[in-house]
């Protein structure tokens, strides 16, 4: 093999190792949308196209100051927890789209790392949502029991007393009506009046009969 052929082979190896700068920029921009293009280009040129080193620094620059646990809302707010879960789901879908189109191995690994972190956060958020639901359910049941304690349920004695009172109320008008019919003095009905008249008539008849009998005695010879 000639020196020319050796040079040609080595130059071919060098050409295969060269990075497609434009393609790398597109991949990094899709992977780190929050970072500016100038910053991505600066880091890429800083490491002379080293994909692994570039990804590590861009990941560090793109990492928020708060940790995953700190970014999750606490304090029993189910609305915020559900909102955070929705955001994680959206980010997981976006990363999956990038994973389906990315060609660089290092970039694909970085996406997979992000997916893993998001899945862990998603599981933690689901756990917190379940705990808050249980707390809310227990709180509602305890409040219902507390409200039932303040409601007085009548027992057997009170029920019987209410029935006796109601019966007394119903009987009271009857008793009063019967008492109103009784006069202050002795009662003289129609039968007694008729009997007195009949007795008077008998006395009058006897008196007349006795008078006529006496007159006949005196008139006899």
Swiss-Prot record:
Residues covered by region (Disordered): 131-194
Molecular function via GO: ubiquitin binding
PROSITE patterns: CUE (PS51140)
Biased composition (Low complexity): 156-166
CDD domains per the UniProt record, alphabetical: CUE (cd14279)
Domain CUE: 20-63
Amino acid composition bias (Basic and acidic residues), ranges on this chain: 169-183
InterPro entries in UniProt: CUE, CUEDC1, UBA-like_sf
Top-level taxon of origin: Eukaryota
Name the UniProt record assigns to this protein: Uncharacterized protein F43C1.5
């Amino acid at each position: 093999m000639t020196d020319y052929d050796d040079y040609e082979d080595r130059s071919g190896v060098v050409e295969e190792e060269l990075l497609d700068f434009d393609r790398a920029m597109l991949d990094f921009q899709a992977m780190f949308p929050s970072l500016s293009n100038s910053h991505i280009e600066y880091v890429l040129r800083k490491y002379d196209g080293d994909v692994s080193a570039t990804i590590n620094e861009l990941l560090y620059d793109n990492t928020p100051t708060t940790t995953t646990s700190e970014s999750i809302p606490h304090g029993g707010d189910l609305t915020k927890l559900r909102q955070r879960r929705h955001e994680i789901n959206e980010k997981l879908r976006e990363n999956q789209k990038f994973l389906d189109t990315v060609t660089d191995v290092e970039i694909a690994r970085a996406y997979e790392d992000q997916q893993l972190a998001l899945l862990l956060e998603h599981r933690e958020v689901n756990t917190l949502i379940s705990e808050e639901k249980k707390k809310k359910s227990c709180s509602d049941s305890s409040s219902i029991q507390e409200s039932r304690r303040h409601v007085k349920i009548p027992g057997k004695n009170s029920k019987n007393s209410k029935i006796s009172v109601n019966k007394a109320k119903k009987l009271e008008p009857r008793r009063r009506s019967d008492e109103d019919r009784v006069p202050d003095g002795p009662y003289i009905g129609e039968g007694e009046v008729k009997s007195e008249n009949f007795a008077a008539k008998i006395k009058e008849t006897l008196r007349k009969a006795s008078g006529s009998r006496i007159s006949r005695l005196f008139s006899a010879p």
